[in-house]
Amino acid sequence: MTDIHIQDGDLSSLKDKVVVITGGSSGIGLATTNLLLDLGAKVVIGDLQPPTTRVDSERCSFHKVDVTVWSDQLTLFKEARELHGRIDHVFANAGVGPKADYLSTALDQNGDLVEPTFLTLDVNLKAVIYTATIACYYMREEQQSPAGGSIVIVSSVAGVSRFRAVDYATAKHGNLGFARGLHQRLTAENSPTRVNLIAPSWTNTGFMPPQIMAAVGVEPQEPASVGRAAAYLMADDSRKGQMIHIAKGRYREVEESIMLPAAEKVVDVENGGVMEDDTLAKIIETMGIFKAKATQ
């Protein structure tokens, strides 16, 4: 696991870039917005409410968006391109805390078990898929530069570990799975669009009251530390299919250095095991050959 040391110069390429951020009005999203503006980027925020603090820049625009609504996100991207002519980077950041209790015994007026809420899964997973899907469309359509655009997705340490906030953990595991699969598809199609993730540890975003965190002896990191990792993944076009873990200002790449090697051990690649995606690639190729022969 390699530590990453992010220097100010590493982010300089973001000057004049156009970045769409969902959930950019508070927490990690707002911290990232402010950093990008300081770097000279142009930021388009999609959120339910305007920024919680004044963002004093003509290069930042706010658009009221419910990220769980497909048409709202479509409008966000359309307006971003109308404003700036292109979209260079997308930060799929909008999220909420855990909401569902899968052990609840609450009954409705008919005496039946109450359906659990899907709000956290809708915001933290479904909406992220919406954001990335639309981002891929715009980046592919515009055929920007050879370096391509990039998508950064917010996962969490809860997405790689056991975490008893079940709906939140499920969504964050889903973020990782979605990004992994999307990276493989983009790579297979030789697309220049990059997808990466960040996995922050406890961060001061209002997820938990500060007095509670202090009582359990945990000092959350500031959102600005997390935003710096997101900006770094946008700026460094060598970063593809990676995930940066952030804890108290320390940055470490964990997908390629830890988790993928662990998967290879599960499959036992060293002793002839074959990764599932390698098999799927051969299946797709073989089906294409059969289809071509059938049409001859």
Swiss-Prot record:
Induction details: Expression is induced on AF medium.
Top enzyme category: oxidoreductase
GO biological process terms on file: terpenoid biosynthetic process
Active site: S155 (proton donor), Y168 (proton acceptor), K172 (lowers pka of active site tyr)
Applications (biotechnology): Ascofuranone is a specific inhibitor of trypanosome alternative oxidase (TAO), and quickly kills African trypanosomes in vitro and cures infected mice. As an essential factor for trypanosome survival, TAO is a promising drug target due to the absence of alternative oxidases in the mammalian host.
Role summary: Short-chain dehydrogenase/reductase; part of the asc-2 gene cluster that mediates the biosynthesis of ascofuranone, a strong inhibitor of cyanide-insensitive alternative oxidases and a promising drug candidate against African trypanosomiasis. The first step in the pathway is performed by the non-reducing polyketide synthase ascC that produces orsellinic acid by condensing acetyl-CoA with 3 malonyl-CoA units. Orsellinic acid is then prenylated by the prenyltransferase ascA to yield ilicicolinic acid B. Ilicicolinic acid B is further reduced to ilicicolin B by the reductase ascB.
Name listed for the protein in its UniProt record: Short-chain dehydrogenase/reductase ascJ
Organism encoding this protein: Acremonium egyptiacum
